[in-house]
């Protein structure tokens, strides 16, 4: 294992990034489905 002292583990970054991407896509499609997507 590389020295990760004081650094955020890569898997945590990947997990958080994945959740954010899924969340943004979900909000985008929900907004478009609700007719609010055009306001974005």
Swiss-Prot record:
A single BP term in Gene Ontology: photosynthesis
Quaternary context: PSII is composed of 1 copy each of membrane proteins PsbA, PsbB, PsbC, PsbD, PsbE, PsbF, PsbH, PsbI, PsbJ, PsbK, PsbL, PsbM, PsbT, PsbX, PsbY, PsbZ, Psb30/Ycf12, at least 3 peripheral proteins of the oxygen-evolving complex and a large number of cofactors. It forms dimeric complexes.
Any one GO CC term of the record: photosystem II reaction center
Family affiliation: Belongs to the PsbJ family.
Keywords linked to the UniProt accession: Chloroplast, Membrane, Photosynthesis, Photosystem II, Plastid, Reaction center, Thylakoid, Transmembrane, Transmembrane helix
Membrane topology: Single-pass membrane protein
Protein name, UniProt field: Photosystem II reaction center protein J
HAMAP family: PSII_PsbJ (MF_01305)
Organism listed in the record: Oenothera elata subsp. hookeri
InterPro entries the record matches: PSII_PsbJ, PSII_PsbJ_sf
Subcellular compartments: Plastid, Chloroplast thylakoid membrane
Chain segments annotated as transmembrane: 8-28
Domain of life assignment: Eukaryota
Gene: psbJ
Gene3D superfamilies: 6.10.250.2070
Known function: One of the components of the core complex of photosystem II (PSII). PSII is a light-driven water:plastoquinone oxidoreductase that uses light energy to abstract electrons from H(2)O, generating O(2) and a proton gradient subsequently used for ATP formation. It consists of a core antenna complex that captures photons, and an electron transfer chain that converts photonic excitation into a charge separation.
């Amino acid at each position: 294992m590389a020295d990760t002292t004081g650094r955020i583990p890569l898997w945590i970054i990947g997990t958080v990034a994945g959740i954010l991407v899924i969340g943004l896509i979900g909000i985008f499609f929900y907004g478009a489905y609700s007719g609010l997507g055009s306001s974005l």
